[in-house]
A protein has these predicted regions:
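N-terminal secretory signal peptides and thylakoid transit peptides that target proteins
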Residues: 2-22
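Conserved class I S-adenosyl-L-methionine
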Residues: 61-68
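Central antiparallel beta-sheet cores of small beta-barrel/beta-sandwich binding domains
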Residues: 198-295
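Conserved SAM-binding motif I beta-strand of class I
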Residues: 85-90
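S-adenosyl-L-methionine
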Residues: 100-122
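Class I SAM-dependent transferase core
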Residues: 28-59
């Protein structure tokens, strides 16, 4: 996978026109263009590829999509070492041709393919793993698309650049990679991991089974994997959820009760949630279910 610079004729003409600008304005304009297109082609070291796939726990059942695939190394490695399937997209026809030829050479053409395509127009819905190595501006441009199109539980891994402060990674790892110094002057790499959370924002009706036997109306607000909300039940004033968290389809939150709190853990499945709750005051456990209230 690699950061990309668009090489189509229209872009070449645009960059040629930039030549008439003063040096400072030219540098700023080129930087904006690289942020928009993802950046120049920079090969990803094999050691970084291996770490990205390790953090994503890629296996034989996975479908990997690589945005800005460059020489194809991530999808090729996923197919060869981990028996996964997938495809990469890039706007450089020559790199796409090179990647497809390499897939054929390695006997991987039935599991690894590469396409000339704009990352913004790529259908991400098949991915169980998404990989990226794009400049910060492009990462921010793609953030909402990634969140909206990928299924809950999909793993997203990025080399060096994140989705910004609003969507913090679920995990990250930084280590020394001396061979990178020759490329960008920095002998280190950082790999970020996100697990796409279920979409739970809205109103829910929660039923708590015996021995607690009660009903709550939940109102949830979500910003990526961050969750907050309120619960009302039994004629009492709404109380705020605490200890709330989304990790893929897993949801955790707590509700104040009798000077303590009920701790809920469960799974989200579309319009329903269910799981177990540790009751306040050590009074045992109970099952709970919740159904989305349609407006």
């Amino acid at each position: 996978m690699a950061m990309r610079t668009k090489i189509l004729i229209g872009r070449r003409r645009a960059l040629a026109a930039l030549g008439a600008l003063p040096l400072a304005r030219l540098a700023a304009a080129v930087d904006i263009e690289q942020q928009r297109t993802g950046g120049p082609y920079v090969p990803t070291p094999q050691v970084v590829v291996d770490e990205m796939l390790r953090m994503a726990k890629v296996g034989a059942g996975d479908f990997v999509i690589d945005l800005g695939s460059g020489d194809g190394i991530i999808v090729l490695t996923a197919a060869q070492k981990h028996k996964a399937r997938g495809f990469g997209v890039d706007i450089d026809p020559e790199l796409v041709k090179l990647s497809n030829n390499e897939a054929k050479k390695r006997g991987l053409a039935d599991r690894a393919a590469f396409h000339v395509m704009d990352v913004h127009k790529t259908d991400l819905s098949k991915a169980s793993v998404l990989t990226l190595y794009l400049l910060p501006g492009m990462m921010l441009d793609l953030r909402q698309k990634v969140f909206s199109e990928l299924k809950p539980g999909t793993r997203v891994v990025s080399h060096d650049y994140s989705f910004g402060d609003e969507w913090l990674p679920d995990d990250q790892y930084t280590w020394d990679v001396p061979e990178k110094e020759k490329v960008n002057g920095v002998p280190r790499a950082t790999v970020y991991l996100w697990i796409i959370p279920a979409k739970v924002a809205g109103r829910w009706r929660l039923d708590l089974a015996a021995p607690a036997s009660s009903r709550y109306d939940l109102t949830l607000k979500q910003r990526f994997q961050s969750l907050e909300g309120t619960a009302a039940g039994g004629g009492t004033k709404p109380v705020r959820l605490t200890h709330s968290r989304l990790t893929g389809e897993d949801i955790t939150f707590a509700l104040p009760a009798a000077g303590d709190y009920h701790l809920f853990k469960g799974k989200v499945s579309g319009e329903k949630m269910e799981g177990g709750v540790q009751l306040a005051g050590g009074k045992g456990v109970a099952r709970w279910t919740a159904t989305r209230v349609k407006s």
